[in-house]
Amino acid sequence: MDPDSTLPPLVPGTLYLVATPIGNLEDITLRALRVLRECDVVAAEDTRRSGQLLRYFDISKPLLSYFQFNEARRSEEIIERLRRGEKVALVTDAGSPGISDPGERVVKAAIAAGLRVESVPGASALVAALTASGLSTEEFHFVGFLPHKSGQRRKQLETLRAVPGTLVFYESPYRIDKLLGELNEVLPERQIVLARELTKKFEEYLRGTASELLTLLKSRTLKGEFVVMVAPAAA
């Protein structure tokens, strides 16, 4: 029996938030592939990158750019498409739309307009890193990317010192040294786990205090975005 034959068809006028692989293409879900095949249009953070993903799975769909600097205008267009009964799939470069990526604005607009929104879950750097970190997963606080300005970053880190549970950040390879330096000043005693290249050939976890990790990174040049996890304060 074809498993798709037992599944309900996509609903017209629905915004589908489709999670895409964070590195390993085998992590895409069967449901994600079905939605991408059956939708009317794919709104993508980077149409070139998403186009490559669609071609890999032999899917041909119109692509609509949706990113940080055009999301206000594009959100209005997507809402109009939904009102006409179109089925719109929203994807980002990797992971779930709206999680440290564009998506929140159009979701809020769709809900405010009384339109249907469905999540199509899948790969998540946050979950992948946290579950393999060895740190407490009973309670955690997802921060995402800190502000770029040093004063704002420091203020937020000072506030987070009192937050219970594991802290989870995203950071680029260009600012990882800066973040570790700030953590060394604000949370010097905490254990930290750096996760990089998740689901890829060179997936790696680095563990230690901020000071220890700074010393380690001096001898290495690391690429790819990091998930930075900070252990809770010792009881």
Where are the predicted features?
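Glycine-rich, flexible N-terminal cofactor/catalytic loop recognition
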Residues: 2-68
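Class I SAM-dependent methyltransferase SAM-binding "motif I" and its flanking Rossmann-like core
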Residues: 105-163
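A contiguous loop/helix-start segment that scaffolds small-molecule binding in enzyme catalytic cores
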Residues: 12, 87, 166-235
